[in-house]
């Protein structure tokens, strides 16, 4: 069900022309910095993949992919991608990318089951990236180092925005705070996962929550994850579960946390088998992607996605993602948004 947050007294700081100029500058500058920080090269990404090969991202396991038949393939079905989490790992292998280097893409997706709102659209655009790593780097410290590099690019980009538009003052702290989802539960035991995210992000300004997908001491997950890309079940060197997480920042416009990135160290053979068993999805072992991983054809990697429209929305102090990207919205939402000062494209 769609929802709309209407910040009291909201007025956009930039007009439409300035907004479009800002989007272009942000996207160009950030992707150059991301590429430099992680040693990534750009590759061309697919908009759709064949159904039944295990390449598309299952997200939380309930979202339906947009599908269509292909006439010249005897009406075989193709799916619009949800993300490129598994496709990127296949590409690392096929392109023979060396350890310590990786790829990034401009990923465009359609998620038809999204609950539309200020932060959620049918249309998803993100930088999907993947980097080859060694088995010995499957540690929390390595995950944190990659997060810090990405966050450094985010901080630099915010200063670029300030130079362009002095009315938009930087708010990101210089350092990002790390916390495990179990520690977050213990800190706020009576809160929902979303309330916990808001509380910790408001306190620190920028947070990376480790361990997304594993069961916590209350028997629940902080949030769901598919079993076949992020490793959320391995017990790390610090004794806590999971080698992945979400990067969130505090958004003063909406007065709530905003997730900008989801990323993690990817499953190896052992973690994949364990997570397929936990999720009762053993049949996936027979799919193309999973067979290649289990046979040792795919490199160990770390990867994730960074929301382009959300990043621009945060930097340009917009209240609705529809002020950044063109999409379809309920007519009632458009009317309410306009009345509240949000001009949806």
UniProtKB/Swiss-Prot annotation:
Give the metabolic or biological pathway: Amino-acid biosynthesis; L-asparagine biosynthesis; L-asparagine from L-aspartate (ammonia route): step 1/1
Which reactions does this protein catalyse? L-aspartate + NH4(+) + ATP = L-asparagine + AMP + diphosphate + H(+)
GO MF entry, a single one: aspartate-ammonia ligase activity
Which GO biological process annotations does it have? Answer: L-asparagine biosynthetic process
For this protein, the Enzyme Commission number is 6.3.1.1
Among Gene3D superfamilies, the record links this protein to: Bira Bifunctional Protein, Domain 2 (3.30.930.10)
The places in or outside the cell where this protein is found are: Cytoplasm
**Gene Ontology CC annotation, any one:** cytosol
Group of enzyme by EC: ligase
What domain of life is recorded for the organism? Bacteria
Checking SUPFAM superfamilies in the record gives: Class II aaRS and biotin synthetases
Q: What CDD domains does its record include?
A: AsnA
Stated family: Belongs to the class-II aminoacyl-tRNA synthetase family. AsnA subfamily.
Instruction: Return the protein name.
Output: Aspartate--ammonia ligase
- Its source organism is Parabacteroides distasonis (strain ATCC 8503 / DSM 20701 / CIP 104284 / JCM 5825 / NCTC 11152)
Its ancestry begins with: Bacteria, Pseudomonadati, Bacteroidota, Bacteroidia, Bacteroidales
